[in-house]
C-alpha cells in the first residue's frame, strides 16, 4: 500500500501531500500491528478493508484515496505471492536440513547392507547409504522445483486490475521497483 500511495503521488493521480499523509498513516498502522495494538473488525471484508478504515479514521478523507487506481484482486494476488515466497524459503531450508541429515546417515552407512525392493519384493542387496542418497536426491529435485516456483513469485501483479488494468496513468514499473519484484505481470 505504501508503494501504491507513493506511485499515486508521483504520477499526480493524487496530491503529493495526500500521498505523504497516507504513507505516514500506513507506517503508523504497521507499527501498531507489529506492537499488537490493532484488532481487526469482522465488520469489514478483509485485512485490506480494515487497514483502509483505520487509515481513514486516523488521517481523514485522504485515507479513502489509497484505493484509487487499484483492484482488491491485485492486493490479494500480491499478498498470496508474498506469503508463498516466504513459505517457500522456509520449506526449502527445512528440506535442505533434511537432505543434510540424509547425507550424514548415508555417509555413516556406506557398508550397511539391506535388501532393495522392487514392486514390494526383495530385488537385490543395496547399502543403507545408497538408499538414503536416493531420498536425498528426491529432496534435491524438490528444492529445484521450489526454486522454480520462487521465480514465479517475483512477478508483480499490482496494476493488473480485476480485468484490464485502469484508466489512471499508473506507473507499474515504479510499483515493481518499490516492491522489489523482478517482473511486471501482463
List where the protein language model places each region:
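Conserved small/polar residues in nucleotide/adenosyl-binding loops
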Residues: 176-184
Amino acid at each position: 500500500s505504501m508503494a501504491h500511495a507513493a506511485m499515486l503521488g508521483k504520477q499526480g493521480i493524487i496530491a503529493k501531500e495526500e500521498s505523504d499523509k497516507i504513507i505516514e498513516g500506513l507506517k503508523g498502522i504497521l507499527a501498531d500491528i507489529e506492537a499488537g495494538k490493532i484488532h481487526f473488525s469482522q465488520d469489514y471484508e478483509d485485512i485490506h478493508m480494515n487497514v483502509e478504515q483505520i487509515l481513514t479514521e486516523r488521517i481523514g478523507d485522504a485515507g479513502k484515496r489509497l484505493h484509487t487506481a487499484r483492484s482488491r484482486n491485485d492486493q490479494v494476488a500480491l499478498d498470496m505471492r508474498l506469503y508463498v515466497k516466504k513459505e517457500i524459503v522456509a520449506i526449502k531450508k527445512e528440506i535442505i536440513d533434511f537432505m543434510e541429515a540424509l547425507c550424514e546417515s548415508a555417509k555413516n552407512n556406506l557398508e550397511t547392507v539391506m535388501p532393495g525392493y522392487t514392486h514390494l519384493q526383495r530385488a537385490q542387496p543395496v547399502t543403507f547409504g545408497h538408499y538414503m542418497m536416493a531420498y536425498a536426491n528426491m529432496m534435491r529435485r524438490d528444492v529445484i522445483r521450489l526454486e522454480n516456483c520462487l521465480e514465479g513469485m517475483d512477478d508483480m501483479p499490482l496494476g493488473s486490475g480485476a480485468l484490464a488494468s485502469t484508466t489512471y496513468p499508473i506507473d507499474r514499473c515504479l510499483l515493481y521497483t518499490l516492491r522489489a519484484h523482478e517482473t511486471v505481470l501482463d
